[in-house]
Amino acid sequence: ARNDTGNINEGGTLTVSNSSNATSVDTATFSSSNSYSSQYPTNSSDVIFNDDGTKMYVSDSSTGYIYHYNLSTAFDVSSASYLNAYASGFGVQSMAFNNDGTKWFILNTTQIREYSVSTGFDTTASNVSATTTSTLSSQDSTMMGVTFNNDGTKMFTVGASNDKVYEYALSTAFDISTISYTDSVSIQSQEIYPTDIRFNHDGTKMYITGTNGRDINEYTLSSAFDISSTVTHKGSYSLTSSDSYPTGFSFNNDGTKLFTTGQYYDRVNEHSLTTPFSLVDVSGEHSGDVINTSSTNNYDTDPDSDTLTVTAIRTGSDEGNGTAGSVGSALTGSYGQLT
């Protein structure tokens, strides 16, 4: 493709390769945060919501307390008010509910515990009782994040000892006494200390956050909720503007909001997503091989099945001018790099 172009926001990264639509740029932006001082963990490890976004739960990995907030406006952290704190007696790294909130799952570094909740999503101590505990240390001794597929027949964890995602089958939905380990996939190339895991609603995207990269990595799965299928890393969204030690995150129901928490600030951070469930994406420049080939001046004439080889590059602000560059090296501009 000759004289091709791509649009990128300041601070973003644009990547070009020889494949269809092979460009990426951040589409999530940090929008707001809310701090709760004494009514918030000092070592926050995860943030989750009830099914309609009117309740929020934030865990503390050091004390085992889980803080419950009401939200007067659904999925709006600025409307949160403290309700109570549940003492789990468990070093909480991550949390999840079943679909109606009558089961609550709490993960520490080696075990997951299932709780019965008599009134869905009401974590008042009198409503909560522990029922089952399962040990996961055979797969990883530092489990950090947990989530389920939609019907509760699969559970996924991420561990920081081996930097892998682990998949388990549940013969009875949302019953951890019936789990069996099935598979794993390494995410070490992107994160060497992962802290949480989530999927989009249809299970075709997986997200991993971690404290080494200080970002959230987005992956696609060729088969929904199946890590034995082709798992492809799409890119990452930096969290350094909201917390330099990110530990947990969640989405709202339609994927237009991302919520993160971490252990550097005592707060929950809210991020807006331009495209639902897309932390890295492109707009306006992905018509074909090597950014944009929609213009007749930019068409490449080889079939898409052919190999495209870049033999020379030049750097500069004007066409036909500039200095010779090295093929295979990143081009550094005022606002980022072209790789």
What is the role of each PLM region?
Residues 1-21, 281-331:
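Extracellular ectodomain surface segments
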Residues 21-25, 70-78, 115-125, 168-177, ...:
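Short loop/turn segments immediately following beta-strands, especially the blade-tip
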Residues 31-40, 81-87, 129-137, 180-188, ...:
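A short beta-strand motif characteristic of beta-propeller blades
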Residues 51-52, 97-100, 150-151, 201-202, ...:
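Residue-level detector of Asp-centered blade-edge/turn motifs that repeat once per structural unit
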Residues 61, 109, 160, 211, ...:
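Short loop/turn segments immediately following the C-termini of beta-strands
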Residues 248-280:
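Blade-level signature of beta-propeller repeat domains, shared across WD40, Kelch, NHL, RCC1
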